[in-house]
Curated annotation (Swiss-Prot):
It comes from Burkholderia lata (strain ATCC 17760 / DSM 23089 / LMG 22485 / NCIMB 9086 / R18194 / 383). One of its GO terms (molecular function) is phosphorelay response regulator activity. It is an enzyme of class 3 (hydrolase). Belongs to the CheB family. It is found in: Cytoplasm. This is Protein-glutamate methylesterase/protein-glutamine glutaminase 2. Pfam families: CheB_methylest (PF01339), Response_reg (PF00072). The active site is at residues 158, 185, 278. CDD domains: CheB_Rec, REC_CheB-like. NCBIfam families: PRK12555.1. Its EC number is 3.1.1.61, 3.5.1.44. The lineage of its organism: Bacteria, Pseudomonadati, Pseudomonadota, Betaproteobacteria, Burkholderiales. It catalyses: [protein]-L-glutamate 5-O-methyl ester + H2O = L-glutamyl-[protein] + methanol + H(+); L-glutaminyl-[protein] + H2O = L-glutamyl-[protein] + NH4(+). One of its GO terms (cellular component) is cytoplasm.
Length: 339
């Protein structure tokens, strides 16, 4: 994998070089010391992956991510001194299109820490699988579902998701009558913080989904672990390790398919910005079961991958700009219409 490094600290750059040198399949393509240089390098010498620091002179990592995704889109992994100390900026960068975040490796530390070489390499491998994979797994159907379940809005998002989710959720009223469950591609270390972050931007309560949680009208639940979130036929949320071989955990396809297979109440599917194809087949399964489904359009997507895949296979009842998705949900849920 050809990798670009964006970091103004020589010691951090050297640490990244040494970690990447542990793998013969990784090569440092270039090093930029600020966001402006990073944008220019991405245009002139497109990498497979950018390792993006957050705090830099001139143009910081959030602004650089936004500019790169606009001019020369590529996979971006935030690598910064302390993810936990920069959570707001991490979510901003992910909202602009970054795929994940990890602490800058410190070679003197043990191998089990979040700042270890292995932690960085694991994130790079995960992104590599996402870039290469074009498959999605389905959840087998369960027994007969329970009746009387409320209206459900199932949302999937990846790169660019935090910003898109913020815009969508803040446009919903406090008395929104449906339950909302979100699967966002994010490491479990950031899930609780992201739920709290989203909660600050919406009139609806946002919390992480626990094993055994039940979706309730007017409440937003966010997938919270690196296992796959699914809905049982009785309308209870759970987590599963299977399927094991998926490029991203949690999988949007797994969740959407569980909704299609077992949710008895009315359901809506929404697939937002993201890289790859996760969610496209699950959205199609939901539409095949009579659910109204929406894919975000290209113009408003930070990364037009997942919604593009959904559009290509006819999975979306409607392809809408981000600002029209919430009004469409409000209209359809208060005045139900058939696809």
């Amino acid at each position: 994998m050809n990798i670009g490094i964006v970091n103004d600290l020589p010691l951090a750059v050297e640490a990244l070089r040494r970690v990447l040198a542990l793998r013969t399949d990784h090569r440092v393509l270039w090093v930029a010391t600020d966001g402006d240089e990073a944008v220019d390098f991405c245009v002139a010498h497109p990498p497979d992956l950018v390792l993006m620091d957050l705090v830099m002179p001139k143009v910081d990592g959030v602004a650089a991510t936004r500019r790169i995704m606009a001019r020369a889109p590529c996979a971006i992994l935030v690598v910064t001194a302390s993810v936990s100390a920069n959570t707001s900026s991490v979510y901003e960068a992910m909202g602009a299109g970054a795929l994940d975040a990890v602490d800058t490796p410190t070679l003197a530390l043990g191998l089990s820490t979040d700042a270890s070489p292995q932690a960085l390499l694991a994130k790079i491998d995960q992104i590599g699988r996402l870039l290469e994979s074009r498959t999605a797994a389905l959840v087998p159907p369960g027994p007969a579902p329970e009746r009387g379940q409320p209206t459900l809005v199932a949302i999937g998002a990846s790169a660019g998701g935090p910003t898109a989710l913020t815009a969508l959720l803040r446009a919903l009223p406090a008395d929104f009558p449906a339950a909302i469950v979100i699967v966002q591609h994010v490491d479990q270390a950031f899930a609780l913080g992201m739920a709290e972050w989203l909660d600050g931007y919406t009139r609806l309560p946002v919390r992480v989904a626990r094993q055994g949680s039940v979706p309730q009208p007017g409440e937003v639940l966010l997938a919270a672990t690196n296992d796959h979130l699914y809905l049982s036929p009785r309308g209870v949320l759970g987590y599963t390790r299977h399927p094991v071989e998926t490029p991203y955990r949690p999988s949007i396809d797994v969740f959407f398919n569980s909704v299609a297979d077992g949710w008895q109440g009315e359901a809506f599917g929404v697939l937002l910005t993201g890289m790859g194809r996760d969610g496209a087949l699950g959205l199609k399964a939901m539409r095949a079961k009579g659910c109204y489904t929406i894919a975000q359009d290209e113009a408003t997507s930070a990364v037009y991958g997942m919604p593009k895949a959904a559009a290509a296979i006819g999975a979306a009842s409607a392809i809408l700009p981000l600002e029209r998705i919430a009004p469409q949900l409000i209209s359809r849920i208060t005045r139900p219409l058939r696809d």
